[in-house]
Amino acid sequence: MPEGPEIRRAADNLEAAIKGKPLTDVWFAFPQLKTYQSQLIGQHVTHVETRGKALLTHFPNGLTLYSHNQLYGVWRVVDTGEEPQTTRVLRVKLQTADKTILLYSASDIEMLRPEQLTTHPFLQRVGPDVLDPNLTPEVVKERLLSPRFRNRQFAGLLLDQAFLAGLGNYLRVEILWQVGLTGNHKAKDLNAAQLDALAHALLEIPRFSYATRGQVDENKHHGALFRFKVFHRDGELCERCGGIIEKTTLSSRPFYWCPGCQH
């Protein structure tokens, strides 16, 4: 499943295609959304916001299209009039004079009014987004030490969108490798230096990934600046200590780590 950096890149692509352009056609597959089609004709996308793995597509009339791709949803950008050859089921079409964005296969799609943005179950539950430029290491440190999260093992905590939105499995293992910790640690047990390093890594690594690499290809190491240090590298040498990277399972997900330098 794509993680925060890949979701933000998808949002960037959607914005680049249609932001600010009047919508000439709008189509929704779900009956409960049909009534909004006419309300959006002539409107434009003001911006596309990411909240973890959810996208919020905002319009000037106050409406916001909420979509969560879950496992199978995917957005595509096409030239207007082009009909992609695909077996996927179309859910949403937002068309402008020259570009059209299409959402396929997703099932979690809603139209929200301003007051619903603060009461929507997912948006209420999800934590601060790691790619939010206003989120600081100090705030992350406060969350790590809060009663809600300080007793949680990192193996599960770093996958919990209520802690920080946008983290996922490859970010989990890369962050813990960066700070030299295993997944069984808890924030309450860290010393000040470890806590500070973790708070910074929780923001720096997702932002570095977003800035310097594209979609995740779990079978290849990219030539971009960001590259995996341990993810999908079991059996290889750790570049930091020369130990052998191992693979196990933590919180029901594959976990990659180096026993030589992660303690």
From Swiss-Prot:
Its EC number is 3.2.2.-, 4.2.99.18. Binds 1 zinc ion per subunit. This is Endonuclease 8. PROSITE patterns: FPG_CAT, ZF_FPG_1, ZF_FPG_2. Pfam families: Fapy_DNA_glyco, H2TH, zf-FPG_IleRS. Keywords: DNA damage, DNA repair, DNA-binding, Glycosidase, Hydrolase, Lyase, Metal-binding, Multifunctional enzyme, Zinc, Zinc-finger. GO terms for molecular function: class I DNA-(apurinic or apyrimidinic site) endonuclease activity; damaged DNA binding; oxidized pyrimidine nucleobase lesion DNA N-glycosylase activity; zinc ion binding. It comes from Shigella flexneri. The active site is at 2 (schiff-base intermediate with dna), 3 (proton donor), 53 (proton donor), 253 (proton donor). One of its GO terms (biological process) is base-excision repair. PANTHER family: ENDONUCLEASE 8 (PTHR42697:SF1). Involved in base excision repair of DNA damaged by oxidation or by mutagenic agents. Acts as a DNA glycosylase that recognizes and removes damaged bases. Has a preference for oxidized pyrimidines, such as thymine glycol, 5,6-dihydrouracil and 5,6-dihydrothymine. Has AP (apurinic/apyrimidinic) lyase activity and introduces nicks in the DNA strand. Cleaves the DNA backbone by beta-delta elimination to generate a single-strand break at the site of the removed base with both 3'- and 5'-phosphates. A zinc finger (FPG-type) spans 229-263. Belongs to the FPG family. It comes from the Bacteria. DNA binds at residues 70, 125, 169. The gene is nei. Its cofactor is Zn(2+). It catalyses: 2'-deoxyribonucleotide-(2'-deoxyribose 5'-phosphate)-2'-deoxyribonucleotide-DNA = a 3'-end 2'-deoxyribonucleotide-(2,3-dehydro-2,3-deoxyribose 5'-phosphate)-DNA + a 5'-end 5'-phospho-2'-deoxyribonucleoside-DNA + H(+).
